[in-house]
């Protein structure tokens, strides 16, 4: 440890002696030094904190830094963010101020005096920082670090500004954020939160509409929506889907072929030949078609290809007729197929089937059945499909700045066909994000504890008595819904003690790997995981070879049927 302290002082001394042209490089070296120091003092902990702000808060609590000392470190963090993102020009005055902050931090960590040569270069006055005054305003998004809570408030520290004391966040407020009551019971110290649509009163108290736990851990929208089942929407549904094999590949295969049909009709200038489309489907999905057990039965095979023709005709009718009908006004010549979205604000990712280029309208296509029984004589969208549409509307608002009230969202059930307009419900979106938070908390707990007993306890929740939140009974529940849930527990209970231990250990390992692949790993220098896309600065991406920029497309052959390619 003594060598670490001496090496750290030597780095600071070299930075302070560098000339004016090296200020940005100096900030990069000091930033890397702070990252290493925080990781060094978190090495024995299992906390999965990939954000520097959270690491500073953790180490500060561990070594007993005062609020003023913490704020000086956060001031350096924010200044280095701005400089490394090319939003601010570095000055020697600020560099020496921040070098002094790091020097005193090193002294605290290693209990080793600052060398005289370095001390003489540091400013005599204490490092100062600016505390943003509270204002009566509305903030769209704030990233904060959770510290503790009481019956009325969550106490958090902001990541993008400096505060003398934790900010207060009002929670469980009726008609505003009461949907996140369960989320707030699951928080742990230093957890990262995104607060969305935040009202700030004159006392500086925050009242957010959304509370998103660990937003760097992205959950797939379709997987989250599938948690909404006929019998309830418990978080364990997410883990049940992950652990269940696909028993019937036929609906999935039909959906893929229907997407191919949509692609053909959108890009077609005239009529599309059905047989040529099916030949293309066979070329694209040869193994899936050959391996599908249902298609080995002659009657089911005939029904499958009859369904393909039905969906083909319905998609043609929708694209050629319904698109141009009054009230829809969809233009296939100005559309994007299968655009993908990453929404750090909500901790979600997903892919749409069809979207107008100006994002004014989008379509999510379903080849399965809608709800034919909720209202007699009327076809209604299923709850999981409505949830999926709501989440896409929320993603467009918080990622692309599109007001959800101005975006037309449609569900296309190609079986009927039915192009159903989706109506936004922000209270429902809040409930779904609360469910997402509970899933993330479960994932975090499993990878943090890495305990066979804890994992066994969590997987024990995957049973009919827990998942059947609506208390269904009768023939439909017993014949069609319950067996798939019971089947998992029966298989688990049939394992020997050794087999169970192996399964739980492997499950823990995969969960840990999945968590680090998304949020990153504190054991490595630099940023890792998918979250580095928005957490890393441009300079960090360039240095690690993760980005090539200033490229121009010379020839675009991406839509070519054979050997699609781009020339840059």
Regions found by a protein language model. Give the residues of each.
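Amphipathic alpha-helical interface elements
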Residues: 1-122
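Accessory interdomain/linker segments of ATP-dependent helicases and helicase-like nucleic-acid enzymes
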Residues: 113-159, 453-567
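Charged, glycine-rich intrinsically disordered N-terminal tails and low-complexity linkers that flank
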Residues: 142-145, 168-170, 174-293
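Short amphipathic alpha-helical face segments that pack within enzyme cores
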Residues: 28, 32, 253, 257, ...
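N-terminal intrinsically disordered, low-complexity, charge/repeat-rich segments that act as generic
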Residues: 52-64, 71-91, 99-102, 106-109, ...
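Structural motif
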Residues: 17-29, 226, 244-255, 379-383
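Mg2+/Mn2+-dependent nuclease catalytic core
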Residues: 158-188, 332-437
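A non-catalytic, helix-rich entry segment at domain boundaries
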Residues: 261-337, 483-523
């Amino acid at each position: 440890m003594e060598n670490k302290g001496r090496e750290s002082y030597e780095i600071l001394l070299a930075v302070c002696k560098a000339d004016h042209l090296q200020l940005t490089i100096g900030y990069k070296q000091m930033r890397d030094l702070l990252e290493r120091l925080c990781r060094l003092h978190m090495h024995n902990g299992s906390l999965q904190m990939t954000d520097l702000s959270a690491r500073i808060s953790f180490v500060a609590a561990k070594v007993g830094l005062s609020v003023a000392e913490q704020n000086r470190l956060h001031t350096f963090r924010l200044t280095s963010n701005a400089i490394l993102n090319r939003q601010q020009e570095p000055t020697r005055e600020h560099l020496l101020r921040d070098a002094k902050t790091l020097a005193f931090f090193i002294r605290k960590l290693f209990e080793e005096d600052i060398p005289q040569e370095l001390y003489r270069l540091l400013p005599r006055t204490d490092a100062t920082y600016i505390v943003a005054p509270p204002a009566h305003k509305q903030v769209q998004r704030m990233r904060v670090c959770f510290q503790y809570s009481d019956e009325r408030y969550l106490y958090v520290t902001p990541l993008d500004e400096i505060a003398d004391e934790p900010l207060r966040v009002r929670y469980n407020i009726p008609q505003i954020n009461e949907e996140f009551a369960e989320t707030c019971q699951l928080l742990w110290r230093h957890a990262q939160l995104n607060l969305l649509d935040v009202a700030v009163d004159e006392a500086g108290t925050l009242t957010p509409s959304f509370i998103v736990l660990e937003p760097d851990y992205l959950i797939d929208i379709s997987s989250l929506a599938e948690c909404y089942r006929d019998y309830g929407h418990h978080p364990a549904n997410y883990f049940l889907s992950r652990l269940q094999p696909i028993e019937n590949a036929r609906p999935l295969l039909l959906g893929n072929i229907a997407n191919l049909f949509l692609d053909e009709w959108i890009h077609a200038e005239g009529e599309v030949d059905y047989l040529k489309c099916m030949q293309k489907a066979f070329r694209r999905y040869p193994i899936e078609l050959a391996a599908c057990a249902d298609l080995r039965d002659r009657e089911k095979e005939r029904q499958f290809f009859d369904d393909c023709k039905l969906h083909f005709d319905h998609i043609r009718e929708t694209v050629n007729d319904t698109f141009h009908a009054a009230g829809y006004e969809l233009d296939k010549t100005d559309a994007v197929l299968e655009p993908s979205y990453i929404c750090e604000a909500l901790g979600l990712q997903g892919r749409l089937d069809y979207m107008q280029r100006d994002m004014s309208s989008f379509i999510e296509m379903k080849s399965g059945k809608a709800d034919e029984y909720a209202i007699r004589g009327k076809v209604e969208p299923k709850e999981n499909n409505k949830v999926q549409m709501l989440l896409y509307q929320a993603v467009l608002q918080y990622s692309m700045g599109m007001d959800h009230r101005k975006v037309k969202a449609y569900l296309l059930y190609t079986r009927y066909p039915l192009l159903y307009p989706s109506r936004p419900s922000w209270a429902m979106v809040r409930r779904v994000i609360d469910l997402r938070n509970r899933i993330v908390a479960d994932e975090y707990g499993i990878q943090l504890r890495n305990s066979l007993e804890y994992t066994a306890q969590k997987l024990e929740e995957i049973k009919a008595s827990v998942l059947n939140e609506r208390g269904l009974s009768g023939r439909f529940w017993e014949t069609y819904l319950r067996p798939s849930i019971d089947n998992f527990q029966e298989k688990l209970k049939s394992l020997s003690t050794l087999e169970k231990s192996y399964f739980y250990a492997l499950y823990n390992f995969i969960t840990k790997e999945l968590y680090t692949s998304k949020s990153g790993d504190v054991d490595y220098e630099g940023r890792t995981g998918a979250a580095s896309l928005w957490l890393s600065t441009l300079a960090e991406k360039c240095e690690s070879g993760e980005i090539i920029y200033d490229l121009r497309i010379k020839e675009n052959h991406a839509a070519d049927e054979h050997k699609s390619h781009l020339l840059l």
